[in-house]
Amino acid sequence: MIKERKGDLLRSDAAIIAHQVNCQGVMGAGVARQIRHRILTAEQYRAYQQLCRKNKEELLGSCSLMLRMDTGATQYVAHLFAENIPTGRGLDTDYAALRQSLTAMMFLAAQRELSQVAIPGYLGCGLAGGDWETVYSRILMPLFSESCFTLTILYLPDSIRRLWTEFGDIPMNPETECIEQAWHGFSAGTHREEIWHWFEETFQISVAEALMYANNKKKIMR
């Protein structure tokens, strides 16, 4: 099952919070940087770096779990090794490796009898250059839609705006007001109002106030 909502990954109470990492031992930007500074202990970060130094060539497509130490609850951080060398230019995310690392995470979670997983919206699609529609429709949906796991995708306000912009780029029949190609789990032929309602129900916002007008784009929910 896949759920989507507004939220901060680092505040999730899911049993596992997962993010993409590279195989070079660097968490220098994006969600990885936040996790490094706000969640991981210095010892855990050194363990990640050591893992990369010793197993760099074998890490791509794997997953490493670390127990979160800053809360009283039992929660793990999943490092998804889906990026080899971070260049920040073009596509650094390896889609096949991302699928493999998520599959590896599911195996590790099942061993621990854990079923609740959270990821950030646009996983692998920030500086790593991935395409979110590819990640969502070709990787996440096949893996999680019919699985025993509950995957919660948490979007920050900027990511919600980005998703809305991408929806606006989908070809739409001007007469029927239906999208002409599948997008984000919606089949071709879906009326735009159905997708608008999905945005409002999923993210608890008003499309008109928060997304449709340029002068309100920075006003999105607080």
Feature map (PLM): residue ranges:
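Macrodomain-like recognition of ADP-ribose-binding/processing modules
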Residues: 1-118, 122-222
